[in-house]
Amino acid sequence: MDESYTAVDDVVVLSYHEPAGPLGFLPTHAYLIKGREPILVETGLYTQTAGFLAALRAEIDPAELRWIAITHEDLDHAGNLEAMLRAAPRARLVLSFLAMLKIARPDLTTPDRVLIATPGQALTLGERRFGVIRPPVFDSSATVGYYDETTGSLFSADSFGGLVPAPTSTADVRDPAYLDGSTIFMSANSAWLHDVAPAGFRRALDVVRGLRPEVVLPTHGAPLKGESGALCDHLEKLPGTEPFRFPDDAAFRVMLEQMKAQGGRAA
């Protein structure tokens, strides 16, 4: 895990950058919202359980959490969910209906502990109101995003994320490094982008444009402040880009060696 930092007001980034070989690093963050009823958005990468819990404990006793919100069930978003539900016995789990079906555990996801998040609705989480949206780009049909009305923060899941050349706590939509990294990541992560109907995709982007969030908080990227319009304009161009070509086995073996040198996972 990296050093945690404040994104905006009382929102803390529990930061981690996963080495990605020649592609650089993939940020894989979770977010802690402090307050009378603390909220954890995402639960970190499953390979980082000990470090994730240590980073969280540096900010708050996990037992004080009242809400754990995940955007979807993938292990880079919900990787430490079981550990968090056990460490925070009074916390309720916020997730989409489909995500609940995919990860249902009779000992952990009991009906009284689950709150279903449905796009188009708003949830009351203690003193916070969370608007629920379907992010414009996603890799799981169970994905939802959360808009915190108090801070104007949009927790956008995979949307607006991207690879970075080095670990960082800042991002700028005008930076070519951000544009290149986000194009590669979202093209690879959501291959359907290259077949999407432009009008339908524009409608999805217009949901974000209508919110005009003060800060966009991707799971896979640094906070993006005051840039939601430019971010949507960038995404709108992605269907016209070349699809990402994944490495073959020989290239994969080279990547493994590069990842070892970076200190990341070798499998």
Language-model segments: residues:
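Metallo-beta-lactamase
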Residues: 6, 91-218, 223-227, 237
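Active-site neighborhood of phospho(di)ester-bond hydrolases with catalytic His/Asp-centered motifs
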Residues: 41-43, 65-73, 93-97, 154-158, ...
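Active-site metal-binding motif and surrounding structural segment of the metallo-beta-lactamase
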Residues: 48-94
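Short, glycine/acidic-enriched loop or turn micro-motifs at the edges of active sites
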Residues: 45-46, 75, 161, 223
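Conserved beta-strand hairpin/beta-sheet module of binuclear metal-dependent hydrolase folds
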Residues: 2-57, 145-148, 152-158
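Short, flexible loop segments at the rims of nucleotide/cofactor-binding pockets, characterized by
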Residues: 16-22, 44-46, 69-72, 130-136, ...
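C-terminal regulatory/interaction regions
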Residues: 226-267
